[in-house]
């Protein structure tokens, strides 16, 4: 079953979701909306990427449409999502990747244009949140607007689930060492809500807040209130790493914990989502990785049998975008069975 998809917002995530959809095979992107990028510029932005390299395929403009690998994609330039003709383009599932329409009410406007479901590629204040490998079984066909959570929650939640299921997390603190994102400044500039966030991205390690750890409690209810965290923004273009420090109820050696994570990474539930490596890796080794979370066995450390630091890498662009595709594929399958 090929699922027909529309993308609203052709920024970092929008473009990389499109790349992943082409690789994924189960999804066909039939429409893209972005009021700030004209068609010729879309071709350029999709073809060339400073982080992920040139697109290995054909990209061209023909008859007012974007053609990728000789397949036509309708292009819209609407500022108001209510005016996007998703239905006419055949897009049933819409990826909301502008970062602007992240509530049920705002993202729900896409339904007016003929979309059946909307997947928000960001955390949402009120939409049901799903993390592949963690809580997809909680999805119900009546949900019209869902959130794919954040890239950091997608990295942390599968790891936390494995640890909690096997050793019971009493409490934990997470730090994500996070690559630069589009909202940051190239040089110092105004950022009234977050003064540190206004400092030059290339010149600084910038402490920042993140709701990613608390959000794990939304997808794993038994961890609600047991995790929180913060972020350091660092001057790299892509790939981030989660550092989870937690107290566990059931004591275990670091070797035992490693073995449990390795076994989980090979299970049908988490294969392709949770990775495992014992290599002496660094961040660029994970550019283009499609897993949500790659556990670094050599980097972690245990103080004793109940207090442990666990380290897991993620391509915050590519891995996250692959999960957006996986989530759409999953919910479309559930929806089809429910009809």
From Swiss-Prot:
CDD domains in UniProt: GAPDH_I_C (cd18126), GAPDH_I_N (cd05214)
The EC number(s) this enzyme carries: 1.2.1.12
Catalytic activity, reaction form: D-glyceraldehyde 3-phosphate + phosphate + NAD(+) = (2R)-3-phospho-glyceroyl phosphate + NADH + H(+)
Protein residues bound to D-glyceraldehyde 3-phosphate: 150-152, 181, 210-211, 233
Amino-acid positions noted as binding NAD(+) in the UniProt annotation, renumbered to this chain: 12-13, 34, 79, 316
GO CC, alphabetical: cytosol
Compartments in which it is found: Cytoplasm
Record-linked SUPFAM superfamilies: Glyceraldehyde-3-phosphate dehydrogenase-like, C-terminal domain, NAD(P)-binding Rossmann-fold domains
GO molecular function: glyceraldehyde-3-phosphate dehydrogenase (NAD+) (phosphorylating) activity; NAD binding; NADP binding
Main location: cytoplasm
Annotated InterPro entries: GlycerAld/Erythrose_P_DH (IPR020831), GlycerAld_3-P_DH_AS (IPR020830), GlycerAld_3-P_DH_cat (IPR020829), GlycerAld_3-P_DH_NAD(P)-bd (IPR020828), Glyceraldehyde-3-P_DH_1 (IPR006424), NAD(P)-bd_dom_sf (IPR036291)
Pathway(s): Carbohydrate degradation; glycolysis; pyruvate from D-glyceraldehyde 3-phosphate: step 1/5
GO biological process annotation, one example: glucose metabolic process
Family annotation (Pfam families): Gp_dh_C, Gp_dh_N
Residues of the active site: 151 (nucleophile)
Coiled coil regions in record: none
Feature type site, description Activates thiol group during catalysis: 178
Keywords of this entry: Cytoplasm, Glycolysis, NAD, Oxidoreductase
Family: Belongs to the glyceraldehyde-3-phosphate dehydrogenase family.
Summary of subunit composition and partner proteins: Homotetramer.
Entry protein name: Glyceraldehyde-3-phosphate dehydrogenase
Organism: Cryptococcus neoformans var. neoformans serotype D (strain B-3501A) (Filobasidiella neoformans)
């Amino acid at each position: 079953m090929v699922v027909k998809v529309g993308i609203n917002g052709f920024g970092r995530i929008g473009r990389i979701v499109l790349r992943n959809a082409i690789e994924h095979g189960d999804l066909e992107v039939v429409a893209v909306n972005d009021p700030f990028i004209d068609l010729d510029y879309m071709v350029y932005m999709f073809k060339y990427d400073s982080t992920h390299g040139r697109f290995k395929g054909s990209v061209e403009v023909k008859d007012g449409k974007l053609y990728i690998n000789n397949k036509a994609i309708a292009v819209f330039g609407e500022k108001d999502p209510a005016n996007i003709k998703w239905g006419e383009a055949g897009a049933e599932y819409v990826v909301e990747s502008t970062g602007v329409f992240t509530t049920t009410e705002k993202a729900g406007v896409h339904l007016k244009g003929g979309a059946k479901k909307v997947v928000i590629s960001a955390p949402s204040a009120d939409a049901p949140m799903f993390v592949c490998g963690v809580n997809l079984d909680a999805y119900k066909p009546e949900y019209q607007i869902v959130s794919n959570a954040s890239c950091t929650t997608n990295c942390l939640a599968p790891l936390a689930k494995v640890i909690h299921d096997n050793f019971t997390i009493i409490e934990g603190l997470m730090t994500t060492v996070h690559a630069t994102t589009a909202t940051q400044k190239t040089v110092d500039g105004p950022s009234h809500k977050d003064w540190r966030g206004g400092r030059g991205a290339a010149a600084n390690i910038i402490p920042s807040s993140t709701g990613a750890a608390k959000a794990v409690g939304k997808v794993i209810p038994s961890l609600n209130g047991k995790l929180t965290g913060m972020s350091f923004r660092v001057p790299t273009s892509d790939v981030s790493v989660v550092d989870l420090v937690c107290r566990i109820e059931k004591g275990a050696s670091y070797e035992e914990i490693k073995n449990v994570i390795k076994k989980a990474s090979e299970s049908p539930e988490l294969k392709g989502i949770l990775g495992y490596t014992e290599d002496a890796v660094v961040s660029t080794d994970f550019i283009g990785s499609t897993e949500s979370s790659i556990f670094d066995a050599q980097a972690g450390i245990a103080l004793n049998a109940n207090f442990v630091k666990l380290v897991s890498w993620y391509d915050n662009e590519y891995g996250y975008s692959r999960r957006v595709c996986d989530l759409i594929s999953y919910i479309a399958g559930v929806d089809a069975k429910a009809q």
